[in-house]
């Protein structure tokens, strides 16, 4: 019998791939036509952790009878804009998924939402890290999000100059900088690797030492990588699925992520994998030159895996 994978790892030896901006945007695009204009007639919250610290019974009562006016997204948050100036802010975290009209309740069902047209939405989450927060009023929504996420990469304000201001003075490796949701919303491990490769920047290079030209390339590469992920309807490496249970295809288009030992698509040299701060990181060190030892962030632990 093969050894079981550690609880928080996939069998490939990487930390599980969390849904990032493209995966959440894919879910939004699939759910919006089904939900917008529909009334919620029944809600069953089966896991009290989903609404913690709020009482799930109180949240259920407030959701019943609400009209879904819009389904939007902020970073990795899926936002249901409801009648009565209410907002349901959902985060899938590690293993959360939203399914539309499954024949049967899947294992690990945590929430059931019944609509007035007879359809239903099921939230499943094996690891139970996902959350659902109901807030009242746009100011409360904005404050909740502002405390947790930074700029939206597809907003007009996300320019190379804005990225320069965010990175100024920061000695952390640029990959760690990209993963900080309080600065740039929605970029996770997959799209950070893909963006850095597109920009020709090594993940260990200190964020605050990037030149203006590098920052301009990085800004464009972030947008391009995220747009490619959306076009492919997300990456289904571990748990991510569409609302009908289908898989995304971006994992078949990775340039470097999870391609250790394979040839670089640009130069043909083998892609390397590092473990940096516990995160699997993929790089072509010919196309993304490693920073000199003196310029590498001091606090970063790096383990090479070929």
Regions found by a protein language model. Name each.
Residues 14-130, 263, 279-306:
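A cross-family signal for N-terminal binding/gating loops and helix N-caps
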Residues 18-21, 153, 157, 211-219:
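Generic detection of long, well-ordered alpha-helical segments
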Residues 39-59, 72, 100, 108, ...:
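Basic, nucleic-acid-binding surfaces and adjacent catalytic neighborhoods in DNA/RNA-processing proteins
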Residues 13-17, 88-198, 206:
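Phosphate/anion-contacting hairpin/loop surfaces
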Residues 37, 65, 148-151, 200:
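Glycine-centered secondary-structure boundary/capping sites
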């Amino acid at each position: 019998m093969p050894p079981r994978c550690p609880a928080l790892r996939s069998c490939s030896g990487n930390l599980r791939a969390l849904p990032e901006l493209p995966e959440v945007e894919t879910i939004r695009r699939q759910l919006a036509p089904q939900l917008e204009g529909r009334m919620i007639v029944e809600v069953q919250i089966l896991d009290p952790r989903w609404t913690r610290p709020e009482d799930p019974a109180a949240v259920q009562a407030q959701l019943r009878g609400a009209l879904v006016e819009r389904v939007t997204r902020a970073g990795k948050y899926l936002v249901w804009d409801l009648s009565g100036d209410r907002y349901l802010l959902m985060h899938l975290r590690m293993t959360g998924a939203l399914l539309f009209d499954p024949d049967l309740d899947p294992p690990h069902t945590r929430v059931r939402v019944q609509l007035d047209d007879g359809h239903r939405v099921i939230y499943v989450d094996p690891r139970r890290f996902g959350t659902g927060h109901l807030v009242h009023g746009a100011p409360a929504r904005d404050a909740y999000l502002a405390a947790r996420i930074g700029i939206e990469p597809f907003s007009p304000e996300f320019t190379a100059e804005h990225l320069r201001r965010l990175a100024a003075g920061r000695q952390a490796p640029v990959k760690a900088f990209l993963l900080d949701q309080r600065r740039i919303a929605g970029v996770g491990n997959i799209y950070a690797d893909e963006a850095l490769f597109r920009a020709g920047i090594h993940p260990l290079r200190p964020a605050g030492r990037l030149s203006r030209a590098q920052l301009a390339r990085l800004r464009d590469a972030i947008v391009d990588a995220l747009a490619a992920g959306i076009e492919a309807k997300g990456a289904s490496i571990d748990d991510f699925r569409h609302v009908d249970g289908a898989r995304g295809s971006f994992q078949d288009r990775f340039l470097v992520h999870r391609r250790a030992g394979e040839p670089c698509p640009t130069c043909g040299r083998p892609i390397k994998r590092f473990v940096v701060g516990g995160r699997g990181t993929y790089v072509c060190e010919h196309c993304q030159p490693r920073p000199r030892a003196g310029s590498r962030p001091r606090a970063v632990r790096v383990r090479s895996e070929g």
